[in-house]
Amino acid sequence: MRAFFLPFIQDALQKAGIETDKEIQIDKPNDKKFGDFSTNIAFLVAKEARKNPRELAGQLIGLLDFPEGTVTKTEVAGPGFINFHLAPAFFMRSAQEVLAKGEGFGCNESGKGLKAIVEYVSANPTGPLTIGRGRGGVLGDCIANLLETQGYEVTREYYFNDAGRQMQILAESVRYRYLEKCGQVIEFPETHYQGDYIGEIAETLFIEHGDGLAATDELTIFKEAAEAVIFSSIRKTLERLLITHDSFFNEHTLYQSREGQPSANQRVIDALDAKGFIGNYDGATWFMTTKLGQEKDKVLIKSSGDPSYRLPDIAYHVTKFERGFDLMVNVFGADHIDEYPDVLEALKILGYDTSKVKIAINQFVTTTVGGQTVKMSTRKGNADLLDDLIDDVGADATRLFFIMRGKDSHLNFDVELAKKQSKDNPVFYLQYAHARICSLVRMAEKEVGFDEATAIGAGLPLLSSEPEIDLASALLDFPDIIQSSLRQLEPQKMVEYLHTVAERYHKFYQECPILKADEHLRTARLELSLAVRQVLRNGFKILGISAPESM
């Protein structure tokens, strides 16, 4: 609704001789007696106007010039809010817009010509995907979907962590299990990867090579074999959740020198050094964040010669700027909270515009059954495996449950609830609303000859009851919900919104006879139902869940 009110409020401000660059807020009052929408613009610009907010609100109301049939009443409330009451026909026109635009309802071209990159999942290829990584994957996928509705050219990227100490430990783990297959007695280190999948990779190598690799200390063949198997497994798991990536960035490329040029990591060190932010002591190389007011410097290259996570992360982001992205969204787990501010500080020092970098941190996931914490793992080590969760509750429930709480909140994933075929299950509740409308349309086609193809919403202005207006009002919010979800990188807002739409539709369905109504009213209510179905479908597409036509 901001798009509707904004030009009229700006026009009133101009008539009043008030210039401001402050963002005009349009909100929905919790209590409908305060109108359908309200704005606090009088508070925001009272100082510039040299008037108290209530007096200014009254002046602005006199200057607002809305088209006939849209706003029925405008009033000053409290210390200076401006409340707007809309005509029922205005809400119904929004439902007509849904039918006219179809899949395009809620979309715009605000991001046209802009390139965005969303990096998500980026799990180390050291084992099967865990549930925690799955939450980040769904979050990132939904954010990418939201960006596409706004016209951005979106690249979905997986930062492939194929370098560093953990990959060496993976290779050593496979080698130890391989040597066991060769008949050697091995004391397997507790610090290494314990899952059954390590033994399975070793078994494959033994079948292919016999004991021919037993005498070598070279880890490359073990690393490459493990990496190929595990990464293939990761991609298959993600595909089950309809999570895809357009590009895979190999971390090892940040360590490589090219055509006589230093590696990307080394270029970061050199550039920070030139700015006076590199220190060398205790055998390590440090990012001197004490110069930025921090208590301690942060290590970039350890005394072992291995880089910390910060160095390749900084170098990786430099490549994003070099690739010309206008917006860079990074989806991380909570373990990155402490590290990432240092990456942004380094980028600022290097002269990059960090306002283009957005961070979405998602908290941990705990699976519960009957209120008790459980491990979703059948055999592959002590881990909560994403595949096992999908096997148990399905892809739709997995996706929706991951994002039905805010990303900043720890998620208790109730496995029993996710499997319920009742309105208590949020997934069932949403999908049932869609299936109910599909069933209604089929019945209308059969019983009264309703033709969905000719439904353009011409009869919608007939509708004026409270359930009908409330339902149409909810549809009107869809474009704003997309914008809000994107600004906050929070798909949970879309989940909550769709629940409201479904809830209002179920109420409308119960209180407003449809097939038994007279012809014109029946057609109008069927058209409103079609508009609801379209909004649900558009929302489901953003969330990546299916829209069943029967349940």
Curated annotation (Swiss-Prot):
Its main location: cytoplasm. Its EC number is 6.1.1.19. It is an enzyme of class 6 (ligase). A motif ('HIGH' region) lies at residues 123-133. It catalyses: tRNA(Arg) + L-arginine + ATP = L-arginyl-tRNA(Arg) + AMP + diphosphate. It is found in: Cytoplasm. GO terms for biological process: arginyl-tRNA aminoacylation. SMART domains: Arg_tRNA_synt_N (SM01016), DALR_1 (SM00836). One of its GO terms (molecular function) is arginine-tRNA ligase activity. Disulfide bonds: none annotated. GO terms for cellular component: cytoplasm. Keywords: Aminoacyl-tRNA synthetase, ATP-binding, Cytoplasm, Ligase, Nucleotide-binding, Protein biosynthesis. Signal peptide: none annotated. The keyword Aminoacyl-tRNA synthetase applies. Belongs to the class-I aminoacyl-tRNA synthetase family. NCBIfam families: argS. Monomer. This is Arginine--tRNA ligase. It comes from Chlorobaculum tepidum (strain ATCC 49652 / DSM 12025 / NBRC 103806 / TLS) (Chlorobium tepidum). The gene is argS.
